[in-house]
């Protein structure tokens, strides 16, 4: 019998990674990271990346697979995750997927049409950039990443310019190329989806603050300093735009003081968690558990039963 795909889903700081590790160790599994920031080498503290000791206890996949100067699309993730799942199954082990990047889960389960759906977060970022720098600045940026589309669009065609840039950010490829590509299939079977929910919003906010302050104490600013000093990175890149990293990047460039950076970092993380929770509400094929003291025992019991008493 082919091992199913077990997915551990939930907002940031809810306790997904700890649960996934426990399940993988108890059920003979290997972990596949579903995190758009953990793919980057050098982004360790701020992404809560599993330590070398944890990775020695249980194999982890799709971590440290890209340089921060590179982009990585949902389509690439779906391809790489399917390869990792096949390899894990070939060893007779259980694929355990864990993370909070909804677009990655969506791409893996349902596949991708050549044209990605609109993304509210990316669109909001582009609208803010247009408000700050003007539509012609966005058109110049489009010329750099997709000259074919830029030549076709009027420099004042805000809506279509934003869409072309949005497609590039979501896929890592020019709109003109995506329009010529076939779609990508998803999983052929239904994954077993476990969705973790915080007991209350205040509980999650306390955990977010405690974790962010612990990351700062562990050297997160120094980690971003090392990235900043490379000289080949900018806010155009997804690695630098990751929650926490972006706010510290602004602090290093003198845009705010240390206390303001902390406040903005916490706010950005809370907003990210809110978006994740909103997306997870639409995952009607998942089984929901409250992240309390009984979580591990309850999920283990449920998963063991669902897998036929493993």
Swiss-Prot record:
Residue(s) at site: Interaction with substrate tRNA: 101, 123
Please list the residues that bind ATP. Answer: 10-17
Alphabetical list of InterPro entries matching this protein? Dimethylallyltransferase (IPR039657), IPT (IPR018022), P-loop_NTPase (IPR027417)
What's one GO BP annotation on this UniProt entry? tRNA modification
Q: Is tRNA processing set as a keyword in this record?
A: yes
Specify the superkingdom.
Bacteria
Report the catalytic activity.
Answer: adenosine(37) in tRNA + dimethylallyl diphosphate = N(6)-dimethylallyladenosine(37) in tRNA + diphosphate
Listed EC numbers: 2.5.1.75
Please indicate if the UniProt record lists Cytoplasm as a keyword: no
Signal peptide coordinates: none
Residues that, per the record, bind substrate: 12-17
A GO molecular function term, named singly, is: ATP binding
What general EC class does the enzyme of this chain belong to? Answer: transferase
The record's comment on protein family reads: Belongs to the IPP transferase family.
Query: What is the protein's given name?
Result: tRNA dimethylallyltransferase
């Amino acid at each position: 019998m082919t091992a199913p795909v077990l997915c551990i889903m939930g907002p940031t700081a809810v306790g997904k990674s700890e649960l996934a590790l426990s399940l993988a160790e108890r059920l003979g599994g290997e972990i596949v990271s579903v995190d758009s920031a953990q793919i980057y080498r050098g982004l360790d503290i701020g992404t809560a990346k599993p330590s070398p000791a944890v990775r020695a206890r249980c194999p982890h996949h799709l971590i440290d697979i890209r340089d921060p100067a590179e982009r990585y699309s949902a389509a690439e993730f779906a391809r790489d995750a399917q390869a990792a799942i096949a390899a894990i199954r070939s060893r007779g082990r259980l694929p355990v997927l864990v993370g909070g990047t909804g677009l990655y889960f969506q791409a893996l389960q349902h596949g991708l049409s050549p044209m990605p759906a609109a993304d509210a977060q990316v669109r909001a970022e582009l609208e803010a950039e247009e408000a700050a720098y003007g539509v012609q600045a966005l058109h110049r940026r489009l010329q750099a990443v997709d000259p074919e589309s830029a030549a076709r669009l009027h420099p004042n065609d805000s809506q279509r310019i934003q869409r072309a840039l949005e497609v590039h950010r979501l896929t890592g490829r020019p709109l003109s190329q995506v329009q010529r590509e076939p779609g990508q299939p998803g999983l052929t079977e239904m994954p077993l989806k476990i969705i973790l929910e915080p007991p209350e919003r205040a509980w999650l906010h306390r955990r977010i603050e405690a974790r962010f302050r612990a990351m700062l104490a562990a050297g997160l600013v120094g980690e971003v300093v090392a990235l900043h000093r490379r000289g080949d990175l900018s806010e155009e890149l997804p690695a630098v735009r990751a929650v926490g990293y972006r706010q510290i990047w602004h602090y290093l460039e003198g845009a705010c003081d240390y206390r303001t950076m902390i406040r903005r970092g916490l706010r950005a993380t809370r907003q990210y968690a809110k978006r994740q929770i909103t997306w997870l509400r639409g995952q009607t094929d998942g089984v929901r558990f409250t992240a309390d003291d009984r979580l591990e025992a309850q999920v283990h019991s449920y998963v063991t039963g669902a897998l036929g008493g493993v």
